[in-house]
Amino acid sequence: VRILIGNHIDPSIRERGDMRAWTQRLLWFARPRDLLILCCEPDAAFVDYALAHTGVKRGELTVLAAPAGAWGDRLLDPASLSVPTFVDRVRAALGPAEVGAVTEVFALWPSAAVARFADALGLADRFPGAAFFGQSGGEIGNSKANFRALAAAAGVPILPGRVCHGRAEAIEATSALLEHSVSGAVVVKQAHNGAGVGNQLLVRDAQMAVDHVGARHLHHLAPGPDGIAAYWAERWPWASGEGRWPVVVEDFAPCADAVYSEHYASDADTRATETGRLLYVGRRLSHQVVPLDGVTEPVRAALLDGGARLAEAYRALGYRGHLSADALVLPDGRVVFTEVNAQVSGSLHIYQSIAHGIVNVAAEPARQVVEYHVPPTWAVPSFAAFLAALDELGLAYDPATRTGVIVSMPAIPLAPREPVQFVFCLAYDPAEGHAGTFDRLDARFANVPAGTYDASQHIGTGAVSFSS
């Protein structure tokens, strides 16, 4: 028996919008007898769809919606977990025998509120890292500023850069980096954000190729010191979260490939769990592929070695659970690390539940899995319409061939008459690739007229529903 909690980053660290759909990826981790806690009642069609793939029966799960807090049913309010009546409800749903049988409390985000919830149930020892997370260790482990210090201590290669605590320091760091930068560009990073949403690329050359970069925002610097000073006068509040967090200023590495190695940190040790590749289009995360291919053995070894050293450094702090070490493969073959996501990343369900659990990518013939974000050019009217199109095109996942599309999360419109926004996985033969299948779906759904969406947006116009 496990308790699975579909939360997201604490709003006290970073405000989020409507996370109902993204947090329902929790269903992919569910096993018989598990109790799931979500911010709302799950989408019934998606529950049936996901469980049909995992083989878990709906009646084998208990699903509870946490009390609506400050964000209604759009986001799980951390404070809701500790409401005494809800704790009693969880205890009653488990039953006296099952409370003692709980083997793990598992949360998408390692919140101090989860530690308090586990303690209220008498299950603090079943939430790995509870003591660390109870003292806001989740914020410590997920800061890009803290990452640079920990990576330096672990001897893991990172790009030239600096952690800045004020505007004057940021101006000085930007000037120094640009003076010695081969690319003539730097990346500004918020301490707390994900999927490139909190990154801004500062360039002097307006013709520089940046489409592939994980940086939602782009700024062309005016010439000279005045251009740098003007930028920070305008953007320091955004970059620092109104002065709450330090800011990372880092050299930009052009023509680099984005990869990652994921690890699990336990009380005893750490172990590698998967490697993969991230691909950006229009500076937004477009898709990711597992397992990682197309790299040399020295690159793979460097990725795993650096990831393992980072995982051990975070474990030594007190972190427990899954974590992802993001890196860049530079054109000369060097691997440099850029951040650690010390949480259940947006990759875990792809490789653990879908690629290995359903597709079995390690079996013969070989398979890979790519997960796509719905592009901003697509207009998908509903979950049912997408599934119907998959059936019509013969693209739904086929267990016999171990190829086809599996929708990874419910498709919930964020506003009336808006297209639904979601992610979907595609299992494919590496010899054939995934572009052909994607192109067939693109031909069906790419109906959004040019000029009506912002290409730098994560998934189109309007509120962003998900990102790691």
What spans do the regions from the language model cover?
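Phosphate-binding site of ATP-dependent enzymes
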Residues: S181-V187, H192, V203-R204, V213-L279, ...
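A long amphipathic alpha-helix within ATP-dependent nucleotide-binding catalytic cores
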Residues: A233-P254, L285-D332, Y372-D398
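Glycine-rich phosphate/pyrophosphate-binding beta-alpha loops
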Residues: Y280-R284, V340-Q352
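Peripheral (often C-terminal) accessory segments that flank ATP-dependent C-N-forming ligase machineries
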Residues: V359-S468
